[in-house]
From Swiss-Prot:
Alphabetized InterPro entries for the sequence: Adenylat/UMP-CMP_kin, Adenylat_kinase_CS, Adenylate_kinase_lid-dom, ADK_active_lid_dom_sf, P-loop_NTPase
Region listing for LID, in residue ranges: 123-160
Region named NMP: 34-63
Swiss-Prot/TrEMBL catalytic activity: AMP + ATP = 2 ADP
Subcellular location: Cytoplasm
GO biological process: AMP metabolic process; nucleoside triphosphate biosynthetic process
SUBUNIT field: Monomer.
One Pfam family cited in the UniProt record for this chain: ADK_lid
Family membership noted in the UniProt record: Belongs to the adenylate kinase family.
Name the UniProt record assigns to this protein: Probable adenylate kinase isoenzyme ZK673.2
Amino acid sequence: MYRVLLSGAAGSGKGTIARMLVREFEPLGFNYFAAGDFIRDHIARGTEFGVRAQSFLNKGEHVPDSILNGAILAEMLKAGPRVVLDGYPRNMSQLKMVEEQAPLNLIVELKVPRKVLIDRLSKQLVHPASGRAYNLEVNPPKEEGKDDITGEPLFKRSTDQLEVARRRLEVYDKTENKVLDYYKKQNKCITMSGESSKAVFESVAEVMRRDLLTTTPRTAYA
């Protein structure tokens, strides 16, 4: 069992880095689970859960735990015992449930200046139906201007969407810092600058390689 959480605000690059890690460690049985992808899939399919989730996301708010937790934990467990997590748990209620059912080994906090985050978000191209986002500098689409999965056109965020993104950054600061403080007290959290995805990937991959070479992965990082 080895579970890694990539934690960072919108625009921090956690999704890009998480996918890089999964590609690197896929031969060792690692899978990728992103709470955002799970939610966007339900929104795209118009499920009851997706409709309810969309109403909160449109306001720049997180989906309440009463709606989210049961569904997302079941999907997370399906990803298997070796998984790179993107964006979950985000608050203490979610953390408690995860630690009871699927405890984490390593948490990576990505620190990026607010000005850089806003700049990245303003440059993102978005697939409206799914919410998938691309950055031309660090995570470009395979074909210019088109979504990797559907081939449909990508669009820049509108002014209204950028304002929602700014509110999401404020929500992140209020909630996720408590989760990170919990893991820091357990010495399971490492903090890194998220301004270079490649540098973060290489550093985290090295930590994972060291742990996976041992019979029992370390559970604390000094």
